[in-house]
Structure formats: C-alpha cells, structure tokens
Amino acid sequence: MSNVDINHARALVYQLLSSLFAREIDEQRLKQLTSEQAQQFWTQLGYAPEFSASVASIQKVLNGLTSDEALLELAADYCGLFLVGTKHSASPYASLYLNREEEPLLFGQQHQQMSEFLHQSKLQVQSHFPEPADHLAVILAYMGHLACHSEDAAQLSFLNACIDSWLAKFVAKVVECDSKHSNGFYSALATLTLAWVQQDKQQLEQAMH
C-alpha cells in the first residue's frame, strides 16, 4: 500500500470510531455497520492481535441487534454512559479529564483549542451535533482529517496533545461504568479506540525516525 492508501485507511478508522461515539446506533446505521463491506472491514481490522478481542465483541453485539428492543437497549446504554453526566457515566469531553478544577466547565479551554484547530483547517462542528468541540467524536474526526491532509509531525503533535493526554482515563471510566450493562459494546469500542490510538502513535513515531 502507498502512503496515500495507508493514510486513507487510517482516516476511515478514525471516522468510524468518531461516528460510534457521536450518537446512538439506529436501524439505518446498523445496516451500514453489518453490511458485507463493513463485515470485511471489521474482519481486516480484527486481524491485528491488539484489536482482535475488541473487534470480536463489537461484531457479536452488532450481529445480535435483531430487534427494536435490542437497539433501544443499546441506545439506553449510550445515553447512560455519555449523555446524563453523573458519577456513573463517562462524559466524552477532554476538558473533564485534563482540567484540575473540581468542576471543570464545558466550552472551556479544550473546547476553545479544538475550535481553533477546526477554524485553521476551515472546518466546523456540524449544526446537528450541538456539542462542545472537545467531544471525543469531534477530536477523532479531526484526527481522521489530519491523516489525509497533514505531515506526520503535525499529526503526532495533535494526537499527543489532544487525544493521548486523556483517552486512557476516559476509557477506564467507560469500562468501569459499562460493566453494569449486559453486552459491553461501549467497553469494547473504548478499548479498541485506545489500542488504535496507541498503535497509530507508535507508527507515526517510527515513521519520523
């Protein structure tokens, strides 16, 4: 594969992870995630030993969503984990993990920083996604953009400062809170995201030496 192809594949993974943190899975999205093309994508991603267990768990849940009730239960898991903002949830905002204040504000420093990154790239958070710019879905989508449009050094700098600096804390919180739910979909998704980011960081570092 050429560097262009590799970076395009990296961008696809970041965009996929971003989309799964951005909103609940509805029936239309489920069809996309379980299509023949998607199954091939999951299988290819799962060949890597560091991703295989998480990918298998994700595929098992997706392929088992055969009723409206099952979809609603997964949507309730998403809401309970990422939308309600209690001690039993895992809020997906960088500011809540990077700021030392006891009650950090949303739309604070990390939001402003991400907004500036987006502005510099002539991008913006879509109007139908009314969230602060330091939401994990926005950050992962932007990393996918950088994969195709920026040099390795800029990608690595952003990854270190805006993702790797807090992702492990977020993932630990997801795993802790999601253990109360039956299928563990979001635990697997979070674990896969962390493993992907760590592997991508390592490959960027190697490419620069």
Swiss-Prot record:
Involved in the biogenesis of TorA. Acts on TorA before the insertion of the molybdenum cofactor and, as a result, probably favors a conformation of the apoenzyme that is competent for acquiring the cofactor. It comes from Shewanella sp. (strain ANA-3). It is found in: Cytoplasm. Its main location: cytoplasm. Keywords: Chaperone, Cytoplasm. The keyword Cell division does not apply. InterPro entries: Chaperone_TorD, DMSO/NO3_reduct_chaperone, HscB_C_sf, TorD-like_sf, TorD/DmsD_chaperones. The keyword Cytoplasm applies. One of its GO terms (cellular component) is cytoplasm. This is Chaperone protein TorD. Pfam families: Nitrate_red_del. It comes from the Bacteria. GO terms for biological process: protein complex oligomerization; protein folding. Belongs to the TorD/DmsD family. TorD subfamily.
